[in-house]
Design a protein with these regions (language model features):
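Conserved PLP-enzyme active-site core in the AAT-like
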Residues: 2-285, 289-307, 313-328, 336-346
Length: 347
């Protein structure tokens, strides 16, 4: 019997995966030193270094907005600017936090192709003006996977990195769904980050089986200078840090992070396949990660909502986003597809 509470509005709707839950339970025994000076935080940090095949600096934050904002603020002065896509989470969904924590670094929007920045679009913005009256570009931020579900290949990231180095720009990656990108491409995390020229990665756990927590990885040690102070000042230094870091141990040690990302991606592919022959239904973007973006009729959207389905429609008239999670059941996907077929036949 399927769980009727499973929805497709967001991969934040799902609960905690067994591996993360078990690690938290184990971390709950006895006392540990506070503020990150505990064995769980050390284990999690070492797991990241092993996974990424490099001696990176590792920090933990409560959520993605804090992780992105603090990471970007470490790369910018207040008179600098950050180049991003028009759909970037830092631009549309972080309530000005990147600007706040950087004391005013402006976000500059560049054109995209299927949600992805290109070397050409970055160059256009970075070289648009170079006078003292304009905020000086200092950082490019990529979202991997993007907000429309597209994924940067290692070659695309390397090309962007070359442009960044040429123009004196740091390269930040918002990896809220980084796991899904790795699962889709079959690439190692190293190949998608520092080996391709990424300076800082915000690795998301909340959307892939954790209750709370993001990891911030600096591949350039110099850029991490005093970052622990930024975290403390921003209220991101957990006193009982082991409960942020232990779930990472749970999902990293046995590759649960990758297993669940593959499952979420598979469910998204399944949904896309099941609705591909429905008249009037169009895929808005290629399905690469765990999201499916469909063009539906407005009456059909209303009918699906009336049936109790939850999904987002922030992408324009008739656009609907359906996100799959680490625990999405295939039968629930099929049920959604059947209802989409039914409402589209009537509307």
């Amino acid at each position: 019997m399927t769980d009727k509470s499973q929805q497709f509005a967001s991969d934040n709707y799902s609960g905690i995966c067994p591996e993360a839950w078990a690690a938290m339970e184990e971390a709950n025994h006895g006392h540990q030193r506070a503020y990150g000076d505990d064995e769980w935080t050390a284990r999690a940090s070492d797991q990241f270094r092993k996974l990424f095949e490099t001696d990176c600096e590792v920090f933990f934050a409560f959520n993605g907005t804090a992780a992105n904002s603090l990471a970007l603020s470490s790369l910018c002065q207040s008179y600098h600017s950050v180049i991003c896509s028009e759909t970037a989470h830092v631009e549309t969904d972080e309530c000005g936090a990147p600007e706040f924590f950087s004391n005013g670094s402006k976000l500059l929007v560049a054109r995209t192709e299927n949600g992805k920045l290109t070397p050409e679009s970055i160059r256009e913005v970075a070289l648009k003006r170079q006078d003292i009256h304009y905020p000086k570009p200092r950082v490019v931020t990529l979202t991997q996977a993007t907000e429309v579900g597209s994924i940067y290949t290692p070659e695309e990231i390397r090309a962007i990195s070359v442009t960044c180095k040429e123009l004196g720009l740091n390269l930040h990656m918002d990896g809220a769904r980084f796991s899904n990108a790795c699962a889709f491409l079959g690439c190692s995390p190293a190949d998608l980050t520092w080996k391709a020229g990424v300076d800082v990665l915000c690795f998301g756990g909340t959307k892939n089986g954790m209750a709370v927590g993001e990891a911030i990885l600096f591949f350039n040690h110099k850029l991490a200078e005093d970052f622990d102070y930024r975290c403390k000042q921003a209220g991101q230094l957990a006193s009982k840090m082991r409960f942020l870091s232990a779930p990472w141990v749970g999902i990293l040690e046995n590759d649960a992070w990758l297993k669940y990302a593959r499952h979420a991606n598979h469910c998204a592919q399944l949904l896309a396949e099941l609705v591909s022959d429905i008249p009037g239904v169009e895929l808005m973007f290629p399905v690469q990660a765990n999201g499916v973006f469909l063009q539906l009729s407005e009456p059909a959207i209303a009918a699906l909502t009336a049936k109790g389905w939850r999904f987002y429609t922030f992408i324009g008239n008739g656009g609907a986003r359906f996100m799959c999670s680490w625990d999405t059941e295939e039968e629930r996907v099929r049920e959604l597809a059947r209802d989409i077929r039914e409402v589209m036949s009537r509307n």
